[in-house]
């Protein structure tokens, strides 16, 4: 999963189309096919009481991002499988909860990503730093377009650096 953080969760995915397609399950028919997945990002999920007892307590540290991947790790360790079933439909307004607070949501994403890399992938600081620099450059580019990114830059740096220091 360390490899995926760089190859598929950054713009490097453009150079690895086969791996990217497989990672995101694009070889499946999302409208008709039930298939096993590692995690479903941005999902509404259901599990049995037995499964809930096996995978709880949930990690409360990440906020808005990475929770599904952490749950996937817990499910795998406990011997449970995660499946995508197209017959299960939940209407979710993507981005409505974060649309008005883009810089805040981005900051939460980066802090949760650093935490996930450190605690669950056991990445060393020299693995995390390039990813952090990449995300920070993207933050800088977003400042050009979005006023809230300009306004929130101090908070982004303070929170992300605090999370990053915990990796050292």
PLM region spans:
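Conserved short hydrophobic patches within well-ordered secondary structure
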Residues: 19, 63-64, 140-143
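Residues that scaffold the ATP/ADP-binding catalytic core of kinase and kinase-like folds
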Residues: 54-55, 93, 116
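Short, flexible, basic/aromatic active-site loop/helix in glycosyltransferases
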Residues: 2-37
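Flexible, glycine- and charge-enriched loops at secondary-structure boundaries
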Residues: 62-65, 99-106, 150
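Non-catalytic, C-terminal membrane-associated alpha-helical segments of glycosyltransferases
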Residues: 104-112, 122-168
């Amino acid at each position: 999963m360390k490899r995926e953080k760089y190859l598929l969760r950054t713009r490097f995915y453009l150079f690895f189309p086969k791996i990217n397609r497989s990672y995101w399950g694009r070889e499946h028919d999302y409208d008709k096919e039930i298939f096993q997945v590692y995690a479903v990002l941005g999902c509404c999920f259901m599990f049995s009481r037995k499964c809930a007892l096996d995978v709880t307590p949930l990690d409360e540290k990440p906020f808005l991002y990475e929770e599904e991947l952490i749950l996937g790790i817990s499910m795998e360790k406990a011997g449970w499988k995660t499946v995508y079933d197209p017959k299960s439909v939940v209407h979710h307004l993507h981005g409505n909860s974060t649309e008005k607070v883009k810089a805040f949501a981005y900051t939460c994403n980066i802090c949760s990503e650093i935490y996930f890399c450190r605690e669950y992938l056991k990445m060393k600081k020299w693995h995390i730093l390039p990813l952090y620099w990449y995300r920070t450059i993207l933050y800088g580019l977003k400042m050009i377009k979005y006023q809230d990114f300009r306004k929130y830059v101090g908070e982004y740096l303070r929170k992300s650096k605090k999370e990053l220091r915990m990796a050292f």
